[in-house]
A protein has these predicted regions:
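Acidic/polar-rich alpha-helix caps and helix-coil junctions
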Residues: 1-131
């Protein structure tokens, strides 16, 4: 028996909302978004977002609902968006002083994770990602 959540209903609804938005099924996307917000907020009134505002609200609710669960990096990568951080992270210019901002473009090789050596050993045709 596994006693940790693997995937929550809100993640499923938000993923479906994003998929429906991308398929231009805006009414279905809004319906899924409203389901999540209705469960989360006691004083919630049904939303009527549309267009870019709907997409932005889906992304915001996904970020809020799934905070600290390790989804953000993969959400940005899936949407081909850059990573923009303040200077409080681990990247530095070699002086030991963090940069004021840390930016990784969506096309950067730093956006790709290395393939585990055990996987490369298991498949000799596999080539390591450039990073």
């Amino acid at each position: 028996m596994i006693d940790i959540p693997i995937i929550r209903a809100s993640e499923v609804y938000l993923t479906r909302a994003e998929a429906n938005y991308n398929l231009k099924n805006y009414d279905d996307a809004l319906s899924d978004l409203n389901l999540v917000k209705e469960r989360r907020y006691s004083d919630y009134e049904e939303g009527s977002e549309s267009g870019a505002a709907l997409e932005k609200e889906i992304q915001l609710q996904r970020r809020l609902e799934l905070a600290f669960e390790g989804h953000r990096f993969f959400d940005l990568k899936r949407r081909h968006e850059d990573v923009q951080r303040d200077g409080k992270g681990f990247m530095a210019d070699g002086s030991g002083v963090p940069s004021s901002t840390q930016h990784v473009s969506a096309d950067s090789p730093y956006y790709v994770m290395p393939i585990p050596q055990s996987e490369i050993d298991a498949n000799k045709n596999m080539v390591q990602n450039k990073y």
